[in-house]
Amino acid sequence: MLNRVEQELALLGITNVKEIVYNPSYEQLFEEEMKPELEGFEKGRLTTSGAVAVDTGIFTGRSPKDKFIVLDENTKDTVWWTSDEVKNDNKPMSQSTWQSIKELVTNQLSNKRLFVIDAFCGANKDSRVAVRIVTEVAWQAHFVKNMFIRPSEAELANFTPDFVVMNGSKVTNPNWKEQGLNSENFVAFNITEKIQLIGGTWYGGEMKKGLFSLMNYWLPLKGIASMHCSANVGEDGDVAVFFGLSGTGKTTLSTDPKRKLIGDDEHGWDDDGVFNYEGGCYAKTINLSEENEPDIYRAIKRDALLENVVVREDGSIDFADGSKTENTRVSYPIYHIDNIVEPVSKAGHATKVIFLTADAFGVLPPVSKLTPEQTKYYFLSGFTAKLAGTERGVTEPTPTFSACFGKAFLSLHPTQYAEVLVKRMEASGAEAYLVNTGWNGTGKRISIKDTRGIIDAILDGSIEKAEMGSLPIFNLAIPKALPGVDPAILDPRDTYADKAQWQAKAEDLAGRFVKNFEQYATNDEGKALIAAGPKL
């Protein structure tokens, strides 16, 4: 096998490899990460939890400005390219620039001792992608071993990669200015050559989200919904999917002791049902506590990999310390969560589709039931809002409209994802709900306890029996009471001492929705959806 891997690397331009560490065990990776001679960002540190912690330097998140896709015959008419009217992260790269950065990365990886991980992206055999990740850094190999689906011995014996990720995080591009790139760092994709190149950034998530962007290209073209969501399944086989941007509660709310986890971030939905793309979870750890998120807290043990957390001198972790970044993370193999779908992370068709939003404006209700038209409207809008800054007195919310709750990872036009999703929902008779995990008129965030109560009411069907009212401006159907949920919060107007305050904020937010949706009003279908949005 090693000879074959070496030959395949040589075909990519990676030559004179000193040694190939092929699909190492967790034990082996631990020893590699703990080597005393390691320096800088290669160095792992053992924590009292048993998990290894690493730092990724200035790159504590993705570098969307450094993302490029090679423009060629195959991609010119399919990719949703960035434009002056609608900006996105899919910037075109020329063939000649690609050749030049490919040489940089292959030169960097040549004459080295390399880690090669072969794994799958996609739990469904019909549509899964065989991925090979090549890196010179042990913990990066550990990260992808955690995050992708680990093949069996038999699958490895016949493994032929469909796609290769070459991680050259130690190399930067000196010619970036002449080539019209954003910086010396790059995250580039060649869909025709089936290769991803990484240079300059050490952030682990570039490998995970890179493959997600590719699944988002290939699968919808085959009629399979590709979704930035978490998913779980109840005892009766009822499947729920939770869409949402980072920090809205996807991982937290789908990790539920009463239901089995399918996955926490990326899924497909085909003729057989919903399936995970990944073999692990990548959870945020800022302010993590055993009390609020017991399953995630307990998943942080040997074989988990922490990124950018603050480790105290005694090796314990200070989860509340966001001094390196608010985006502290842990990756772990999915089986670190007790309650998962086994042996394959897939289940039947979804009957509940939940859109999570964290509305910092304090306008949206904690839960509303959507009509089919509203489902399309709120899916394409992909709204959430953050509270800016941690300085005292600065509480100005910043709205984010991210198409399909994952604009950064969409390789095709957003309407293609909406179309496939709605088709799948219609076929399974799925209902959609908008759940606000953010703030209300009290100035406080809606409690996890109330949000869990809302999710329970959606999943056990009690929301269907609730008497409904309507929220003006947004025309959303809201329940008047739900078991286990504080009734005072269900209508957001009731959380304000003065309802006129809600009205003013609601008009402001509605205006932002209307403005954002103008980009979809370029055809008849888009124009027809405007009626499902807020009315001023």
UniProtKB/Swiss-Prot annotation:
ATP binds at residues 209, 228, 244-252, 293, 329, 445-446, 451. It is an enzyme of class 4 (lyase). Keywords: ATP-binding, Cytoplasm, Decarboxylase, Gluconeogenesis, Lyase, Manganese, Metal-binding, Nucleotide-binding. Substrate binds at residues 62, 203, 209, 329. Binds 1 Mn(2+) ion per subunit. Its main location: cytoplasm. It is found in: Cytoplasm. GO terms for biological process: gluconeogenesis. GO terms for molecular function: ATP binding; metal ion binding; phosphoenolpyruvate carboxykinase (ATP) activity. Its cofactor is Mn(2+). InterPro entries: PEP_carboxykinase_ATP (IPR001272), PEP_carboxykinase_C (IPR013035), PEP_carboxykinase_N (IPR008210), PEPCK_ATP_CS (IPR015994). Pfam families: PEPCK_ATP. PROSITE patterns: PEPCK_ATP. The keyword Cell cycle does not apply. It catalyses: oxaloacetate + ATP = phosphoenolpyruvate + ADP + CO2. NCBIfam families: pckA, PRK09344.1-1, PRK09344.1-2, PRK09344.1-3. Involved in the gluconeogenesis. Catalyzes the conversion of oxaloacetate (OAA) to phosphoenolpyruvate (PEP) through direct phosphoryl transfer between the nucleoside triphosphate and OAA. Belongs to the phosphoenolpyruvate carboxykinase (ATP) family. Monomer. This is Phosphoenolpyruvate carboxykinase (ATP).
